[in-house]
Amino acid sequence: MSKLNIVVLAAGLGKRMYSALPKVLHPLAGKPLLVHVLDTARALAPHTTCVIYGHGGETVPQTIADESLIWVPQIPQLGTGHAVMQALPHIEKEGITLILYGDVPLTSVETLKKLIAMAGKQTLGLLTVELPDPAGYGRIVRHSETGEVAAIVEEKDASESQRSIGEINTGIMAVPNRYLHGWLCKLENNNAQGEYYLTDIVAMAVKDGVKVATANPAYVWETTGVNSKVQLAGLERIYQTAQANKLLEQGVALADPARIDIRGKLSCGRDVMIDINCIFEGDVQLDDGVKVGAHTILKDVRVAADSVIAPFSLIEAAEIGRNCRIGPYARIRPGTRLEDEVHIGNFVEVKNSALAAGSKANHLSYIGDAVVGRSVNIGAGTITCNYDGANKYQTIIEDDVFVGSDTQLIAPVRVARGSTIGAGSTITRDTPPDMLTLSRAKQLSIDGWKRPVKKPKPKN
């Protein structure tokens, strides 16, 4: 098999994006457009991947920061042909070069493999699509007798008859390296744009007797580029719809497939149910029977079987055990591990803590930097006071502890097995096991006490 070189053109300005951010760094499904393209390129196992950048300067390579890539600036930007010229020192004399675009994020690996398979030492492969309205795109001109590709004519240089052609060039092509060097050197810029068009090498291929083969993607949107926020939003919906359909085909129950956002990888077991307006970021795994309530955000989370995440919960970088109950309005922060049958209720925040099986914090509490044993009850309003303004400290709550409401645990502190903490206590020292511990001021009732009376407002 011929060595594969990939060149990604990512130097465009993106004027219609109306943004200081380089176009290829705008996010789709939570990651930059260019990263989508590079992930696809990586799946093809190329010998080299060269990225041509320009507008935005070093912002693009600094943001991506991938040492396996070859970054080459294009200054000034004089067209697609000129862009590929910049990569020539990094392209071998033999093999195939696949040309991709940093603002065309959804081309599938399968489509590109099909295109690459068509290309060879004597064949140039083009990815084309038929559009009902081809305005603005380069047209594929074929010989009237043989049907073979003769040339690609850009919109601004096309005749009236050529503009009626519905087959358009997507820009994605696989070119034999043995010809690429020579063809690029012959490019001229005597066109309406004054640019060096990469598409002109197609006519050169025909002239040199190199076959020009065409392939089509499974879906037209695989070759759709982004030039505006409108197009970006449209591709976002296309991507999310495709992801939702995959989940449905796997047996996941979605309350509304149009109202789910996947910004990473979502893996689901059997009988998983997802309500509306949920967002999944990073690597999320939902095991069998998990139910996710509406308006929930999960990021880099594993949720074990039969657990329920109630609406409006936020969980990130955490591990949730079997048959847990989370929320509504719960926040679980990074470093948290909940074992089986743990309950975290409304307006409870847990950070960098481990809760053993059967423990509960059902209302209005903060558990930070804590280790909580089995079958512990955390009363409403309990706070682990873990920060002294400079350092964080750990709270340890052993098995079978009952913590009364409105308790402050001043870390570092240990609550021993079987302890009961009276409501309203501030615990500053370790507690003994199997005893009631409380710290309160003595309750007083003052006879004859009068409430303050508001002073009358002065008259104007």
Curated annotation (Swiss-Prot):
* Name used for this protein in its record: Bifunctional protein GlmU
Give any Gene Ontology cellular component.
membrane
Q: Does the keyword ATP-binding apply?
A: no
Chain sites annotated for binding acetyl-CoA: A380, N386, Y387, S405, A423, R440
Which CDD domains does this entry report, sorted A to Z? GT2_GlmU_N_bac, LbH_GlmU_C
Subcellular localization, per the record? Cytoplasm
Question: Cofactors per UniProt?
Answer: Mg(2+)
Please give the residue ranges the record annotates as the region N-acetyltransferase.
Answer: 251-460
Residues annotated as region Linker?
230-250
Region described as Pyrophosphorylase: spans on this chain:
1-229
GO molecular-function term, one example from the UniProt record: glucosamine-1-phosphate N-acetyltransferase activity
E.C. code: 2.7.7.23, 2.3.1.157
Where along the chain is the active site annotated? H363 (proton acceptor)
Per the record, what are the reactions this protein catalyses? Answer: alpha-D-glucosamine 1-phosphate + acetyl-CoA = N-acetyl-alpha-D-glucosamine 1-phosphate + CoA + H(+); N-acetyl-alpha-D-glucosamine 1-phosphate + UTP + H(+) = UDP-N-acetyl-alpha-D-glucosamine + diphosphate
GO annotation (BP), single: cell morphogenesis
Q: In which pathway does it act?
A: Nucleotide-sugar biosynthesis; UDP-N-acetyl-alpha-D-glucosamine biosynthesis; N-acetyl-alpha-D-glucosamine 1-phosphate from alpha-D-glucosamine 6-phosphate (route II): step 2/2; Nucleotide-sugar biosynthesis; UDP-N-acetyl-alpha-D-glucosamine biosynthesis; UDP-N-acetyl-alpha-D-glucosamine from N-acetyl-alpha-D-glucosamine 1-phosphate: step 1/1; Bacterial outer membrane biogenesis; LPS lipid A biosynthesis
The family classification in the record reads: In the N-terminal section; belongs to the N-acetylglucosamine-1-phosphate uridyltransferase family. In the C-terminal section; belongs to the transferase hexapeptide repeat family.
Give the residues the record marks as binding Mg(2+): D103, N227
> What binding details are noted for the cofactor?
Binds 1 Mg(2+) ion per subunit.
Q: Which domain of life is it from?
A: Bacteria
Residues bound to UDP-N-acetyl-alpha-D-glucosamine are 9-12, 23, 74, 79-80, 101-103, 138, 154, 169, 227, 333, 351, 366, 377
**Where is this protein primarily located?**
cytoplasm
Q: What keywords are assigned to this protein?
A: Acyltransferase, Cell shape, Cell wall biogenesis/degradation, Cytoplasm, Magnesium, Metal-binding, Multifunctional enzyme, Nucleotidyltransferase, Peptidoglycan synthesis, Repeat, Transferase
The role this protein plays is: Catalyzes the last two sequential reactions in the de novo biosynthetic pathway for UDP-N-acetylglucosamine (UDP-GlcNAc). The C-terminal domain catalyzes the transfer of acetyl group from acetyl coenzyme A to glucosamine-1-phosphate (GlcN-1-P) to produce N-acetylglucosamine-1-phosphate (GlcNAc-1-P), which is converted into UDP-GlcNAc by the transfer of uridine 5-monophosphate (from uridine 5-triphosphate), a reaction catalyzed by the N-terminal domain.
